[in-house]
From Swiss-Prot:
Keywords: Activator, Coiled coil, Differentiation, DNA-binding, Neurogenesis, Nucleus, Repeat, Transcription, Transcription regulation, Ubl conjugation. It is found in: Nucleus. This is Neuronal PAS domain-containing protein 4. Residues 14-53 are annotated as: Helix-loop-helix motif. The keyword Ubl conjugation applies. Ubiquitinated, leading to degradation by the proteosome. Its main location: nucleus. Efficient DNA binding requires dimerization with another bHLH protein. Heterodimer; forms a heterodimer with ARNT, ARNT2 or BMAL1. Changing residue 587 to M: Does not affect the transcription factor activity. Changing residue 293 to R: Does not affect the transcription factor activity. The gene is NPAS4. It comes from Homo sapiens.
Length: 802
């Protein structure tokens, strides 16, 4: 064993350094780059070029004529590409990196490769997992893969772009050469296109180098994504001519299922300040009626400038992969920022590869056919005629509203068109031209259609309501109404009740109290003398083709107003309820919650409806004529005098003449006439008469009682008492024919039974109590409910009734 000495160690180091310098001379690099290389950089580059040489030497030679392009021509083509070429193995080992990478990342190829021989050394650590997933995803060798990641850039470039550069990678795996190493590490060749907001300048608006060497077309949009300019290459991917798409809304080409995703990214682009970008994976409709997956990258050129979009046509599998990646990034951003309510990238679950590749038969209509999706409560919209000649936009873009062409439109519509604006990010699609860009209103915007109306609720873009506000691009707008609906608040009524209303603690969203609503005209017809249920009224309004409804009747859905005065006058016109107030307090009952437009017709309440404030006898259909009322009063007086006569013996005058007829009534039958020698009437304790006026329940035509029933009531009570001495054996004391009266010989038991019978309550008297039940409002509370024990000479009660 030889002991290492100082001289031997130095000799070995010198030998290793000499070999490294020899390797440096073999590297295909410029002399200027070789001078800057360290020993570690030289060894790293040597490994890369060795793997590259082995792979291409053992691979299958390219088919085709040799000498078609020279080496210099190939280098020129690679240098002209709008990106750089990248070759690496499945485990991430680099094989090749083109020289053009320095134009996009700021680093030269030598600087990047010198950092390490793995692709993970030159990409952002946050995207390592994405690249690993793409490299391990099983698929056929000829299947393209498309994903995006961020590459490290130089310090100077990072200062300009505020971070690493986002790069779109498209590539595929190649057949590996023979060998165990290549069998486990297939080679992936990719073209990397930096996603730049300002690609290399091309000759005017036509195709530039980016569109020549990459499947891509560019477009410029207004703030509402109306197309201002588009590349001619759109003809290749969508089949449209450039002139056919100018002044059209970009939303008109979108698939209905992608509206929410696109609008959310559009809002994010407009809401954030600075140099930001928005990404989306959507389906655009081709001229043939099919759908093409497009990866869109949008940049805003300042707060007043237009929006630039780079559109990359992708396959179904690439769309599925990109959607997964975008969704995962949004989820991670929400977790890091601690904001779970981030903008959703996609409204629904991520589509599978089969769903992306399969054609949806529901959306295969031709381009010329109307394309729309019906919403339950959305108003119908009208289509602008395609034959209308609309002005072309000038080169100096003006983002103010455009006027409608003159025509036989109502003056109301012309007046409304000046106040209505198009709120981004939604622009309705009108096939007639670009007049819709800045002059039509939102379909769900709350607007009161009155001739002098200037009320307009500007819809602020919200992340939670985009999917509810967006309608398909071919949706049509209705003509404004020339008169308000029946029961709908007008501008005058809105101002009147807003001045008289104050907030209340009780909340009734989307509804108005009947006392605060002002109706255009009274409902006086008998057909309207009945309350219309809300569901019936709402359905009736929906069935009307010429009526539109605001989403809410209240101008501010977060505030509810109630009248300042008490609610007593409200209850004067409504039926009584257990919670009806008596002292003017406001007691509100719960109202049903209805989604959508609320329109309820409230006609006048019938005049004769029972209320606590008015006695039933005072209502119109309870009135009697003067003659009928006089007859009823005389009958009551006669019954009262008959009841008083039972408490004292009949006098001689009464015995000789009988009862005098009262009030012109015919005299009673002779069977009731008693002689002076007769016995007195039984002194029975009769049950006090209840003085509730229940006569209004009877039919006025059959109100008068005949004399015969009155005789039957007092027949047995007027017979003489056998216990008194009134001349035994007197023939006058006997009844007709000499037969004794049936009440002559009564035992004490029979006498007690008659007393009980006189005080017995019938079933009707027992059921009708003098006092109301608990929780029951006595509708007849103004009538006297106290029991009267005696009557005056004139027949009135002991105490006044009212």
């Amino acid at each position: 064993m030889y002991r290492s000495t100082k001289g031997a160690s130095k000799a070995r180091r010198d030998q290793i350094n000499a070999e490294i310098r020899n390797l440096k001379e073999l590297l295909p690099l410029a002399e200027a780059d070789k001078v800057r290389l360290s020993y570690l950089h030289i060894m790293s580059l040597a490994c890369i070029y060795t793997r590259k040489g082995v792979f291409f030497a053992g691979g299958t030679p390219l088919a085709g004529p040799t000498g078609l392009l020279s080496a210099q021509e190939l280098e020129d083509i690679v240098a002209a590409l709008p990106g750089f070429l990248l070759v690496f193995t499945a485990e991430g080992k680099l094989l090749y990196l083109s020289e053009s990478v320095s134009e996009h990342l700021g680093h030269s190829m030598v600087d990047l490769v010198a950092q390490g021989d793995s692709i993970y050394d030159i990409i952002d650590p946050a995207d390592h997992l994405t690249v690993r997933q793409q490299l391990t995803l099983p698929s056929a060798l000829d299947t393209d893969r498309l994903f995006r990641c961020r590459f490290n850039t130089s310090k100077s470039l990072r200062r300009q772009s505020a971070g690493n550069k986002l790069v779109l990678i498209r590539g595929r795996f190649h057949a590996h050469p023979p060998g165990a190493y290549w069998a486990g590490n297939p080679v992936f060749t990719a073209f990397c296109a930096p996603l730049e907001p300002r690609p290399r300048p091309g000759p005017g608006p036509g195709p530039g180098p980016a569109s020549l060497f990459l499947a891509m077309f560019q477009s410029r949009h207004a703030k509402d994504l109306a197309l201002l300019d588009i590349s001619e290459s759109v003809l290749i991917y969508l089949g449209f001519e450039r002139s056919e798409l100018l002044c059209k809304s970009w939303y008109g080409l979108l698939h209905p299922e992608d509206l929410a995703h696109a609008s959310a990214q559009h809002y994010r682009l407009l809401a954030e300040s600075g140099d930001i970008q928005a990404e989306m994976v959507v389906r655009l409709q081709a001229k043939t009626g099919g759908w093409a997956w497009i990866y869109c990258l949008l940049y805003s050129e300042g707060p007043e400038g237009p929006i630039t979009a780079n559109n990359y046509p992708i396959s179904d599998m690439e769309a599925w992969s990109l959607r997964q990646q975008l969704n995962s990034e949004d989820t991670q951003a929400a977790y890091v920022l601690g904001t779970p309510t981030m903008l959703p990238s996609f409204p629904e679950n991520i589509l599978s590869q089969e769903e992306c590749s399969s054609t949806n038969p529901l959306f295969t209509a031709a381009l010329g056919a109307p394309r729309s999706t019906s919403f339950p409560s959305a108003p119908e919209l009208s289509v602008v005629s395609a034959s209308e000649e609309l002005p072309r936009p000038s080169k100096e873009l003006d983002f103010s509203y455009l006027t409608f062409p003159s025509g036989p439109e109502p003056s109301l519509q012309a007046e409304l068109s000046k106040d209505l604006v198009c709120t981004p990010p939604y622009t309705p699609h009108q096939p007639g031209g670009c007049a819709f860009l800045f002059s039509l209103h939102e379909p769900f915007q709350t607007h009161l259609p009155t001739p002098s109306s200037t009320l307009q609720e500007q819809l602020t873009p919200s992340t939670a309501t985009f999917s509810d506000q967006l309608t398909p691009s071919s949706a049509t707008f209705p003509d404004p109404l020339t008169s308000p609906l029946q029961g709908q608040l007008t501008e005058t009524s809105v101002r009147s009740y807003e001045d008289q209303l104050t907030p209340c603690t009780s909340t009734f969203p989307d509804q108005l109290l009947p006392s605060t609503a002002t109706f255009p005209e009274p409902l006086g017809s008998p057909a309207h003398e009945q309350l219309t249920p809300p569901s019936t009224a709402f359905q009736a309004h929906l069935d009307s083709p010429s009526q539109t409804f605001p989403e809410q009747l209240s101008p501010n859905p977060t505030k509810t107003y109630f009248a300042q005065e008490g609610c007593s006058f409200l209850y004067e016109k409504l039926p009584p309820s257990p919670s009806s107030p008596g002292n003017g307090d406001c007691t509100l009952l719960a109202l049903a919650q209805l989604r959508g437009p609320l329109s309820v017709d409230v006609p006048l309440v019938p005049e004769g409806l029972l209320t606590p404030e008015a006695s039933p006898v005072k209502q119109s259909f309870f009135h009697y004529s003067e003659k009928e009322q006089n007859e009823i009063d005389r009958l009551i007086q006669q019954i009262s005098q008959l009841a008083q006569g039972m408490d004292r013996p009949f006098s001689a005058e009464a015995g000789t003449g009988g009862l005098e007829p009262l009030g012109g009534l015919e005299p009673l039958d002779s069977n009731l006439s008693l002689s002076g020698a007769g016995p007195p009437v039984l002194s029975l304790d009769l049950k006090p008469w209840k003085c509730q006026e229940l006569d209004f329940l009877a039919d006025p035509d059959n109100m008068f009682l005949e004399e015969t029933p009155v005789e039957d009531i007092f027949m047995d009570l007027s017979t003489p008492d056998p216990s008194e001495e009134w001349g035994s054996g007197d023939p006058e004391a006997e009844g007709p024919g000499g037969a004794p009266s049936p009440c002559n010989n009564l035992s004490p038991e029979d006498h007690s039974f008659l007393e009980d019978l006189a005080t017995y309550e019938t079933a009707f008297e027992t059921g009708v109590s003098a006092f109301p039940y608990d929780g029951f409002t006595d509708e007849l509370h103004q009538l006297q409910s106290q029991v009267q024990d005696s009557f005056h000479e004139d027949g009135s009660g002991g105490e006044p009734t009212f």
